[in-house]
């Protein structure tokens, strides 16, 4: 039996995780799960730092990932990777699947600029102050990952090159 594969894009808000995820799907046919859609449903009127919300959202994400892997051999999803619930979810998924993490690198000012110019319909709406707090925490946590993608003004072609190298190592090995 083939081991199902999970790729997790980890990085600050505005680093390009969603865009890179769509490239995984469009170019490499690796299903990109928009977990932020699930988070928006779970959020209701709660603060994004609400412990019950955070716990519930990662439970919903893990359940959704597991469901998706019933139909797909490989999936990719994104996270800032900040909470203990994220860490717990990763450990749980690693027990049953091959899981690789990719750090998306982008400078703080560039992330904020991207957030201000992107469509908000697919993202949880947060203030500049919240974005800065979240991104500062992401940079401080500095999660160790299996791979890195530099998205500081990378062109689509440069991103595809970086993704292709990772796909060769993760999916086709």
Please state what every model-predicted region is:
Residues 121-162:
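Small-molecule kinase domains that catalyze NTP-dependent phosphoryl transfer to phosphate-bearing small molecules
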Residues 12:
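P-loop (Walker A) phosphate-binding loop of NTP-binding proteins
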Residues 15:
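ATP-binding Walker
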Residues 22-70:
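Conserved substrate/cofactor phosphate-moiety recognition/catalytic segment
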Residues 9:
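Hydrophobic anchor at the beta1->P-loop junction of P-loop NTPases
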Residues 95-115:
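Conserved phosphate-donor/acceptor-positioning beta-strand/loop module used by diverse small-molecule
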Residues 18:
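Walker A/P-loop
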Residues 56-96:
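Glycine-rich phosphate-binding loop used to anchor ATP phosphates in small-molecule kinases
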